[in-house]
Amino acid sequence: MGVLHTISESPCALAELCDRTGLPRATAYRLAAALEVHRLLARDDEGRWCLGPAVTELASRVNDPLLAASAAVLPTLRETTDESVQLYRREGTSRVCVAALEPSSGLRDTVPVGARLPMTAGSGAKVLLAHSDAATQKVVLPGAQFTDRTLAEVRRRGWAQSVAEREPGVASVSAPVRDSRGVVIAAISVSGPIDRMGRRPGARWAADLLAAAEAITRRL
């Protein structure tokens, strides 16, 4: 946090960051580089660190009802499945991870909060695209690893699954989260290694995903 606060005052390069924080050069670089990976820091035209886009994104969610509602549900889902859980929102033709929790041990499918993923692969993408407008579907589907028939099946069944679509060796299952009017506003997901999730992850976890999605809706 000290590095973030320092750079929020004015952009700076490594030498100045060390002077202003009192941190050793290696430590300052390691911390700043890690923050840059998570988009909390970025580089300006002069190569100096400055605040990154994730800071604004996080600030906009401080009073976000969806995140407040999901905070009471995601931990239970993680304990039930012992896998990684995420919450995604659609932004244009991408999806953004707005909340994520990891299991305490074992291999994980880590998706950082703020990560922007394509809508062309993965169960979360299928759920969000299945409930998107026709114009968005028309743009995304030509490059997707699924078809409009897949989306119709997602709407009929109420959930989606994927195996090695977004990333080799990873399987996932997702369900839509609706607001009080019934409009889909997010996708809740469970993901993990295929060796644990299996090649039909929906058969194992879809019911729990649907219950978690409904629990979030009730809290909105």
Language-model features: locations:
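Flexible loop/coil segments at beta-strand boundaries within sensory signal-transduction domains
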Residues: 178-184
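A short beta-strand signature within small-molecule sensing/ligand-binding domains used
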Residues: 168-176
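Short amphipathic alpha-helical signal-transduction/dimerization elements
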Residues: 8, 129-133, 210-217
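Conserved GNAT-family N-acetyltransferase fold
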Residues: 85, 175, 188
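Juxtadomain coupling helices with adjacent low-complexity linkers
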Residues: 143-152, 156-160, 168, 186-220
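Short hydrophobic/aromatic beta-strand element in the GNAT-like acyltransferase core
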Residues: 40, 97, 174
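N-terminal helix-turn-helix
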Residues: 1-64, 218-219
